[in-house]
A protein has these predicted regions:
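Active-site gating loops and adjacent loop-to-helix segments of metal-dependent hydrolytic enzymes
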Residues: 45-46, 59-67, 102-128, 170-187, ...
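A conserved glycine-rich beta-strand in the N-terminal activation segment of trypsin-fold
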Residues: 15-24
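C-terminal cap of metal-dependent C-N hydrolases
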Residues: 286, 296-329
Length: 329
């Protein structure tokens, strides 16, 4: 199938320019600059979300790839979750958030199911080949061995729900941790003489920061500081999407209510279109090893988010096939 799309092409590396994409057999076959051409719709690489609990609404927000996420649960729940991952070309695997977390940083996770690191349980999950990311607290006994176990199985060790100090966080990165789950939330903060996990995450260029930029989880100034300190090439916009999101009696937030284009709109207003595409598309795709996604260049898969001039979604394409389209009035 062949299709030509014309509008404002937003590539994380080449920037935003008027042009056209030629799509053939699920791939981007050609890219043509058209100076003076139309600047709507806005065409961006499809968004990739590394932490999403409720993925059904995601394609309507331009999300073309996601990690289906399961939280801290009773024994046996993760196994059943992995057996029933959605049969969806956009599902890139699972993110297991917990249960090896610090109870003092449980946040909205089910504290009653937090438990010590269990190498046998973890190995069972990893043996399915469906787990792409596991979030754990690095200060737990056995956490460093678990980080190595995850990495050797081809997964991404992620750090989160932690009260660790700066040194332990840094050592965990040295051990192989490569992602910070919803940075700032449910983790030790930054102080003048005790920079905590945050200090290590901002400092160390080997780790990617999951930023929930929905306007609820973080103050806008915190979002700004994080992007400016780490740079867009180390930020992956994540949604933690749950329907409906809840505020628990202890004031903790359970999940987010915005994903994909809704996050991009907030970031683009402050950092620009190309930088937003970097954080929403290229960085998470690269972290997952998806070398054919996240850019608008020939040979890449035609996973696209097509937006109007206000960055509201118009259409979502996965491998060149339309999977969602906004109804016209």
């Amino acid at each position: 199938m062949t299709r030509t799309l014309e509008g404002l092409l937003v590539d994380p590396v080449d920037g935003a320019r008027a042009g056209a994409l030629l799509l053939e057999n699920g791939l981007i076959a050609g890219v043509e600059a058209r100076p003076g051409g139309p600047e709507e719709p806005v065409i961006m690489p499809g968004f990739v979300d590394l932490q999403i609990y409720d993925w059904e609404p995601a394609r309507a927000q331009g999300v073309t790839g996601y990690l289906a996420t399961v939280g801290t649960s009773a024994p046996g729940v993760v196994e059943r979750f992995l057996e029933t991952l959605p049969d969806d070309p956009s599902c890139l695997g699972a993110h297991v958030e917990g249960p090896y977390l610090n109870p003092d940083a449980a946040g909205a996770q089910a504290a009653e199911h937090i438990r010590p690191v269990d190498a046998r349980e973890l190995g069972g999950w990893l043996s399915t080949g469906r787990v792409r990311m596991v979030t754990l607290a690095p200060e737990l006994h056995g956490a460093f061995a678990a980080i190595e176990q995850i990495a050797l199985a081809g997964g991404i060790p992620a750090l989160g729900h932690t009260a660790t100090n700066h040194r332990t966080a840094w050592l965990a990165i040295d051990e192989g941790a490569r992602f910070a789950t919803h940075v700032w939330n449910a983790m030790s903060g930054f102080r003048a003489r005790a920079p905590g996990a945050i200090g290590a995450f901002l400092e160390d260029e080997r780790i990617t920061l999951g930023l929930n930029a929905d306007g609820r989880h973080l103050h806008p100034a915190t979002e700004e500081l994080t992007v400016r300190a780490a740079g867009p090439r180390r930020i992956a916009l994540t949604s933690d999407l749950v329907r409906p999101p809840q505020e628990l009696p202890n004031g903790k937030l359970l999940g987010g209510d915005r994903c994909g284009a809704a996050l991009v709109r907030r970031m683009a207003a402050r950092f620009g279109l190309a930088e937003s595409a970097t954080m929403a598309s290229l960085v998470p795709a690269e972290l997952l090893g998806l070398t054919d996604r996240g850019r608008l260049v020939p040979g890449f898969r035609a996973d696209l988010a097509i937006l109007d001039g206000s960055l509201e979604p118009l259409e979502t394409l996965v491998a060149g096939t339309s999977v969602w389209r906004r109804d016209e009035p």
